[in-house]
Amino acid sequence: MSLPVIMLGAGGHAKVLIDALLESSAVIAGVLDPDPDLAGACVLGVPVLGNDSIAVEFPPSEVQLVNGLGSVGTPARRRQLYDKFKALGYGFATVVHPSAIVASDVVLGEGAQVMAGSIIQPGSSIGCNCIINTRASIDHDCIVGDHAHIAPGVTLSGGVSVGEATHIGTGAIVIQGISIGVNAVVAAGAVVVKDIPARTKVRGVPAREFA
């Protein structure tokens, strides 16, 4: 990572990212968080500098940002934060934990995050601002759209397509060749055996739609 990084957010997901960055010997200039009570505190030894307005003190040419907002509960906010700072000219660092296994031909979009123990097999493509969370397994030739979240322990079999801003919950399994549309939600532990349309929520074994 050629430039020092600024972490946006000081919550649980940000903490995991800071650990991954420190394990990769990245230089972290500080953390930004809107909570005034956190100003001056540290997250894993990294100082909280203040709220997002502090970012203007770091020109886009001198830092990269890392989106520390998690997807669960704040998916729209996470995307808004990414879009806001991209519009201001900032770039987002791609974070890959040293213990992750990523095939040499995998395409990782700007700001993609690949957490500890994850596996991404050959021919796969991961979009911008995605989270491939702890121990997720992405098999060959999968496509994960921008802003999607593949939660801890998820298994995507070969040739799966996941649409933009879709959430695949913890421990879910998706069999080979399945297509999941944009803004869909797959609940934790679901087993997906047929295609899922856009903006659809599914749960259960096998996965079925719910309101």
Segment roles from a protein language model:
Residues 14, 37-38, 101, 209-211:
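Flexible, glycine-rich phosphate/dinucleotide-binding loops
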Residues 20-23, 44-47, 79-82, 108-109, ...:
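Short, glycine/charged-enriched secondary-structure capping and boundary segments
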Residues 24-25, 86-90, 194:
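Short helix-capping segments at alpha-helix termini
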Residues 94-210:
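Structural signal for interior beta-strand "rungs" in well-ordered beta-sheet cores
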